[in-house]
Each structure stands twice: as structure tokens, then as C-alpha cells.
Amino acid sequence: MHVMNCVSLASDKENGTLATAAAFMTGQTSPSASPPPPPPPPPPPPCPHSGEGFSPSPPPPLPPPLPGGPPIPPPPPPGLPSVSYLNGYSSLGKKKRMRSFFWKTIPEEQVRGKTNIWTLAAKQQHQYQIDKKTIEELFGQQEDTSKASLPKRGGALNSSFRDAREEVTVLDAKRSMNIGIFLKQFKKSPQSIVEDIYQGKSEHYGSETLREILKLLPESEEVKKLKAFNGDVSKLSLADSFLHCLIQVPNYSLRIEAMVLKKEFLPSCSSLFKDIRTLRAATKELMLCEELHSILHLVLQAGNIMNAGGYAGNAVGFKLSSLLKLADTKANKPGMNLLHFVAQEAQKQDAILLNFSEKLQHVQETSRLSLDITEAELHSLFVRTKSLQENIQLDQELCQQMEDFLQFAVEKLAELELWKRELQGEAHTLIDFFCEDKETMKLDECFQIFRDFCTRFNKAVKDNHDREEQERKQLQRQKEMEQKRYSWSTGELGSFGRSSSENDVQMLAKTGTEDLPSFLKPRPNSPSYRPPNTRRSRLSLGISADRELLTFLESATSSPEDPNKFNSLPRSSPRQARPTIAWMEPREQQSHGPNFTHEPQASKIQEKAPPPAWQNQLPTTWREEPASPLPLAGRSRPSLRKRNSEPVGLGPTQSPPLLPLDLGVREHELVTGLTQFDLQSPKSLEEGSQLTLNDFCPTKLPSPGDRSSQPFAAGGDSLPPKDTDTQEVLSPAGEDDRTISDEPSSEALVSVVVTDTEDKDAGPLLYVSDTTDCSLTLDCSEGMDSRAGGDKQEEEKEGDGSVSSGAGEAGSSQVSSNSVSSPPGEVPAPKSSKSELSCQGGLPKDRPSRGKDAIAPKRNSFKEASVGASKPVSARRSQGVTTKPVRTLNSSENEHMRKVVPISKSSRGAGPWKRPEPTPKATPRETPSSTDTPLSRRSSVRGTSDTSPRRPQVSGSGAEEPRLPRSSGSISGRPGKDAPLQPRASFRKPSAKPLRNIPRQKPEENKVSSPNSPDPESPKEEPKAPQATGVSRALPPIPSFARNTVASSSRSLRTDAPPAARTTGLTRTVSQRQLRVKGGSEDSASKDIGTLKRASSARASKKCPESAGGSSANVETSLKGRGTTERSSLRLKDSGQATLGRILRPLQK
């Protein structure tokens, strides 16, 4: 139970004396394991130790001693003093205060008189003593504690606690605690605080503090208890002491209340003065603000207007509460209501009215005030002061203390009362001013209405201002837009206002088609310019061709107007003249014989167009040979057709007014690419051209009186330049133009001479502007078909406006070939002009007269014709010269040409001129071969699709047959119906895919020299041309109506001239199909015919076997032409290998 005992037990456990513990539990004494501690000051006498046992203590029986255990020291003498000592309370106890050990003790009654561990330990405790000195050092407190402290702790302290408990009986413990906490904040003794209360010194305490003291005042019972306390006051607690002292002050409660009132009166009085002053000022503002009154009158007027005729109309006033309903009345204008309108009207009347709220400042301040609250505060202050004044009279001392304050308070309260009365009066006046009921309308409510009205009115003013600003900005933007629109409409921005197409359509709608010719004239190059769409479908090509045919017709009849007017159609070159068609020419000219027309115009063209210098440099023979064919292409150069779209008539077929358009200078200028000269075989070129002329010459054209000759006469405008230029002018200008126009026109096919010329000179010139070429793809088979003839017939008959350039080209090239076949020096005056006239006339007007070949060259579309011509020329050049040809605009490649007019097979077949049935070979194939140049153009339009290998064009029928599927009804397809079939040659509709700048192998000289001189371009005619060459000189009797036709000429040519040679020349069309076929047949043809076959287009190559036999008559001449033609075609081939290689390889295989 005692500390020492615990320590002893712990020591025993540490020493492992469990036996001793067990002995204590059983009441035995175990021998001490360690030497006994020093005995107390009066040590008891030591007992003898026996090694075998312990000295038993007398009272309890000792257990048997453990063997070997040390003897147990003798127990202390029995008695409480020993226990007292053990507990440390004896005189021998600690002299130093120790730290407390917080444990829970067992009550003494539970330990005494019972056998337990604690009683056992008490008996043996004298043997196990704690070292007091050590424990005091370790756990003793530094300060000395007197021995009396212990008894004080047990006695005196307990007595003090007992005294406190007695005071607590006076005050509740919790209350005493709260009071004590409150008193500690003053840092003063309770007596000092009570003294200040007694003297009325409130300066050191706040009103809140004094109010707290009032709350802590003792109750009556507590007062009684405190008064009944007679003990030492110093022994009372802080709270009890404070209350005991406080109750000793007389009227302590009244004094404290007086102190609180004195402390709060001034602040409360000042606040009341301020509030009353504010309310009075607000009342005056509402009554004196004229701007507010004006606004209210505006509201009254607006309300009367809106309510006119109703029960609420014609009002003389309105309740103030109605002001808040203004914003609820919405206007028709979004975001606007009646309040906005009133603000807007106030702004119109006077902008000062909008600022009325600035004069109601005190009204805004009244938001935190209330008249009722102010009156209540004033009344409370007055009651308190009066009560204090009455109560203070009982205590003279207190009365003296508060006298001054009370006097001051009474005065202030009287003043406040006066102000309150004035405020009330003014409030009533204000309510009456606004005609409100004093009973129901309170001053606070009135102020609140005007506060809200001011806020809403200011917001409405701001909204109006924002709206006006927004409208102003919007108007400004609109004005700017109007100015821009005006500037655009007035053309300030130049040509960007409207597109040329819009202007063109509008003008055409107003003026009709009379201005169409102007659209077809060259257009200045511009960023917006683009070549005609190369992906036109056949239908679109046909429509475009029809439209352009109309244009050509119009232009032929109408005087040349401003060339740039409505020039919306793209042109390959602004310098190219629009090709004229024979049927476009005035009928007076048409009535003239072909010779008559051709010669004068040819001379004119020769005069107009001086030969280029490079042409002059060329061998005369070479220049002369192409001269005849080139004049067709070259002289008709002013009338150069676009490969894609322009009619066959390349020569100046236009009426005399249009003749000025045929400028030789243009021809020279059109040469855009580098010109390559092939001086190797000028003679061969000459010969080839002569052969071609001869071949064409044998193909005798009917007299001008014939229907076919009439078309030639019509085409005479374009042909005469060619005729006259045939040798001289042709070689310079004609060659140039021809090289330019050869690709687009079938003229390239017309004669080997032309091909050679092109090979040498035009080879580089062969490059034709892509304007029309883009839309053209070589379609030899298609072009070779009796498209030229058929097309010509249909175009002439239908007036589609789709004059197949192929036909015209073919015709022109044939004419040139005829002229070339006559001696180079000579220009076949009647015959060549006749043939040329026939060709041109056939092209523009009597395309049937061109014969089936001419029809074949006449492609369904101008694009086709143009492409065909350009391709054959390219073929010839490539053969003749390895150098890559420079592509230039051909006469058939007028800038104006955009689309090919697809001519229905029936229409082409139904050409007015029927040629005698060609030999089955030549008929289908030959006609295409003669038409190859135009057809190749068509193939250039369709050629891509037609690139599939076709039978050799040498035999017109053979080569034609593949085309016949396309141009069913072509002349070759219908040998019996030569004339109609010839028109069908133009069956071949240009492939939608145009080939651009694809060098075409020049048709072999055989083709060129094919008697289809009227349509040298058509590959079909070319194969027959070799045969016809001989026949043309010995033409079998042919009906007059068919003599001028290409069919008749091709027949005769077929009979005589070796078709292979001519096919090669005519194959100049080099449609992709022909090129493919060329792989096989052209090789054979080239072997037989030499360069002429090489020049022939792929179809011509196909036809080569057939035409080779037919062309045996003219082998020599054709061979000569072949040399040149092959060189040129070789050039074209080389240049076109890249593009045509892909097409030719499969076909050749």
C-alpha cells in the first residue's frame, strides 16, 4: 500500500525472489535474498541467522524456510508507528516535498485485519526500505517544504477548502465562476470597481460593460446570504467578495443604470438627430424637385394617351405605386417598355430631366431609415431619462452626481421631440402633396417608391443610350456597306464587279446572237483565262460546237466588230483569226467557181502574210510543197480553228469583210515554239508534196457549179489564201501557219509535203497552244471515219455551228496537196484551186464534196478536228525529224475554237456530196485515213478512247471499220453510200478526253497525197489518196454532184494512189488509235511507203497494207514525200512518244 512496499516488491521481482513473494502470500517469511538494509535509527537487536531457516515472526506462522536462503531479518516491533513510518508520515519521514505519484489507493478498511499482500508487506517492510535520500534527489522538488506543509495539506488546507465551501453556499458555483471571469477583465480589485460605481465614474467603462454589470447584480436571496455572512471577508472568493462589497453601496442598481444612461445618451441622441434630419431633407427634396414633377407629368400624359377612351383615361393624377408599373408595360420594340419611352421623351424635352435622381440624394439615404424606428428610439431615450430623473431624487448624493447630465439630457430630448413633430408634419404634407392617403401611405413607403423609381429610371436612360449607340453604329456600318456597294456598282473596283461571263450573258440576252462572233474572237490573256474544258462530254462538246457554229455563221455574215467585245470564250492565241467556213461565206462567193474564189483570196492572203524568215531559209522545194497544203491551214490561219471547236473550213471562208482577219503576220506570230529545221531531204519533201498534189489533183473536184464546188466556193475565202500561198507564201507563212494549224487541222494530213514542211520547220512549230488541244484527244479511228465528210455535210445542212475542224482541215490539206502535186513551182490554178475550193467548200459548206475523206476529217467536234490535224502533223514531224516538235497553234487550232460539234452519224452520212463507193478496203478505212488528220483531231478529242488499235487505214474501209462503230454510217462504213458515208466519217465524236500538246506523228505522205485532197486531214481519205492519186489524174466518170465530193476524189485516188503512202500522210491525224495500230501496220506501211507511212497516223498504218497497194502508182512520189513525212513524223513521234507512248505501246504490241 505504501510506496516503500511497492518498491520493495519491485526489487524482489527483479532479484528473482519469487519464493519470498510466495511466502508472503502464504504468510511465511522468506529469507532475504540480499543483505538487510540498514536498520532504522533505533535498530532492533539483530536476531541470530541460521543458514537453514528464518527467524519466524511471532504473530503469523512462518512457512518453512527455503533451503539455502538467507535468514530473514527480525520483523519490526508491531504497532501503527511503524506503519506510519513506512508511509512516510513519521518523524523520520521525508523532509523534502516529493513529486506526486498519481495512483488509486485502496481504502484502509479493505486492507486491515485481512490476510493480503499488503498486510504481509507491512509485517516485512522493515526489512525492505527505500533509500529516501536517493528518491528525494530524484523526485523531490527544489523548494523546501516545511514539515508543516504536510499537516497543512491534511489540516489547514482542508479547513480553507471548508471555508470556501461555506461561501459557495452563498453564491452558485457557476454564477460565481461567471462573475469571476467578468471581473478579471478590469484588472482591478472588486473593491476598486465597487468604488467607481459608488462615485458614478463611468468614464473608465463602456456602456456594454456597465450593462454587463447590471446583468450580474445579485438576486435578493444572494444578497441576504451575503449580508448574513459574518466571517472573514478576505476568505471569500473573488465573486463573493465583489458582490459582498457591491451590496454595501446604497442604490447600486440605480447608480449603474444612471451610468449606462449617461454613457449611451449622447450617441443615441446624435443618431436620432441625424435620422430625423435626413428624413426631413428627403421630404423636402421630393416636394421641391421640379424635374421629378416633370417626369411624373410625362408619365401622366403617357398613361392618358394609352388609356384614352377607357375608364382609366383622362386621369388627373395617379398613385405613386403606379410608377413601379411603368417597366411592366412592354413596348412593341424589343427591349423597350413604357419607362424607356418616358425617359426617351424626357430626353427629347430636356436632357436635364434625366438627372432628377441626382437631386434626391437624401431619398436614397432613407433606405436604411425608418420613421417608426426613429420615434421608438427617441421615446425609449426619453422614458429612461425621465425614470432616472424621478428615481434619483431618493438619493441626494446620486442626485447631485447626475444633476448636470440629467439637465443636458432633458434639453436634448426636448429638441428631438420638436424635430420629430416637424418631421411628422412634413411627412403628412408630402403624402398630401402626392395625393396619397395618410392613413395607408407611410413616409417610409413613399421614400421606398421613389428610391426604386429613381433606380429604374436611371437604368432605362442607360438602356436608351446604349440602344442609340448601337443603332448609330449599325447605321454607320450600313452606310459603309452602301458606299462599298455603290463603288462596286459604279465600277470603282474595276472589272472585279462582275465576271466576263455575266457580262457576256447579259449582253447576249439583250442583243441576241448577233454579237456571238465577238465572243469567238481572241481574248486578251488574263489570269482568269483558262483553256477550254478538256473533259467535256460528247454532249457538251456537241452543244458547244453548235453554239460556236452559230457564232461562225453569225461572224461570217456580220461585219467584224470589236474583236474583244464579250470575248468570254478562251482563245489559244489572241493573234489567231477566227476560221471561216465555206458555208459561212456569202452565197455570192459560193456561187463562184472554186478556182475563182480560191485564187483571188489566196493571192490576198499571200500579200497579207509575208513568209517567215525561217521559212525562207528552208529549201524551196520543201517550202513549196507544204505551200499548197499549208495555205489551207496557213492561209486560212486568220480563220484558224481551234482544234476543239472550230469548223473544218480553215481558209478564210468568211465573207470579204472577214478576209482582213486572215493575216499572214498572225501565222508567223503564232509560231510560239522553237522552230527546228530538217534540211536533210527537202527534195523528198517536195516530191512528197508533189505526189500529194498529184494525188489530190487526180481527185478532180466537180465544177464550181456543182454542189460540192459551191461549198468550196464558199470556203474559197479561206482556200484562196492557201491556193495562192500554196508554194511560196505557203512555204513561209503557210508552213508556219500550217505547222501551227497542222495539229489542230487535218491539213497536216493533207499532203506529205506539208508534213515535211512541218517536219522541218513546223516540226517545232507543231506545238499548238493548249487552248483547244486540251479538250482534244487523238482518235484516229474516229477521226478517220467518214467523219469529215459526214460532219461537213451535217454541219452545212444543219448549220449546227459545229463545223468540224477536221473536215475543214482535211479539205484544206487536200487542196493544198492537190496544189502541191502540181509542180512545186506551179500552183495548180484551176485544179489545185478547184480541189482546194472543193476542200474548203466541202469543209465549210460542201463537206460532202470533200468526200467521205473530208467528212472523216471533219470531226464530230471542232476539238476533234483540230486535234487530229495537229496530231498528224506531229506524227509526220516525228518521223521526219527526231527533234521534239514545238507545238504551235494550227490553223485549225484557232483560239476561238473551244468545242467540237458532234455531228450525228446520220447527218454526216447524209452529206450532200456522195463520193463513189470506195473499194471495200479503202472505203471504210481509207476514208478515215484521208480524214485521219481531222479524225485524228477527233481522235484527239475522242482519240483517247479510240486509242484502241484499229485496222490499218490504208484501205479506207478496213481502217474505217474500227471507227465505224463510233462513226457508224461513216463513209468508210457505208461504201455504197459514199457521199453520205463520207459525212459519216465525222461520226467519230471527239473523245471527252483531250490530249494537250501531244506531238502527233505526221500522216505519211501517202495519206497526204491521197486523192482526198479535199479532205487531206481525214485519215480515211489518205489511204485512198494514194490510190486516188492515180485515179485523180484519170478520174472515172462520177456524177457531177459527187465529183467535188471527197468521196469521189477519194475513190479515184484510192484506185490509183497507194493507200499506204497516202494513209501514212493522212495518218498525220495520228489519232491515238492510229498510233496504236501504227505499231503494227505503220511499220509495214513505213517499210512499203517509207517515211510517208511513218507519217501516217495509227489508222493510216493499219490501212497501210491496203493503201500500199493502192499507192503503188504514186510510189515514187509518195516515197519522196515519205522521206520528208517520215522525218517529220519521226520528230513528232519522238516528241509525242512520252504522251502517245502509253497509247501506242499496247497497240503496237
Curated annotation (Swiss-Prot):
Region entry MTBD: which residue ranges? 960-1086
Question: Where in or outside the cell?
Answer: Golgi apparatus; Cell projection, Cilium
Assembly notes? Interacts with CEP170.
Where Phosphoserine occurs, residue numbers? 501, 645, 655
Chain segments annotated as transmembrane: none
User: In its UniProt record, which GO terms are filed under biological process?
Assistant: cilium assembly; Golgi ribbon formation; stress fiber assembly
Q: Which InterPro entries match?
A: FH2_Formin, FH2_Formin_sf
Compositional bias ranges of the Polar residues kind: 486-504, 554-575, 591-604, 681-693, 926-947, 1042-1052, 1064-1074
Recorded hits in PANTHER family, A to Z, give: FORMIN-J-LIKE, INVERTED FORMIN-2
Tell me the protein's name: FH2 domain-containing protein 1
GO CC annotation, single:
microtubule
Record Pfam families: FH2 (PF02181)
Q: Where is the composition biased (Low complexity)?
A: 522-532, 801-822, 965-974
Q: Could you tell me in which tissues this protein is expressed?
A: Brain, heart and lung (at protein level).
Compositional bias of kind Pro residues: 33-48, 56-79
Which residues are in the FH2 domain?
88-483
Recorded domain comment: The FH2 and MBD domains are essential for its function in regulating Golgi ribbon formation.
Compositionally biased region (Basic and acidic residues): 464-485, 784-795, 844-856, 1123-1134
Q: Name one GO molecular function term.
A: actin binding
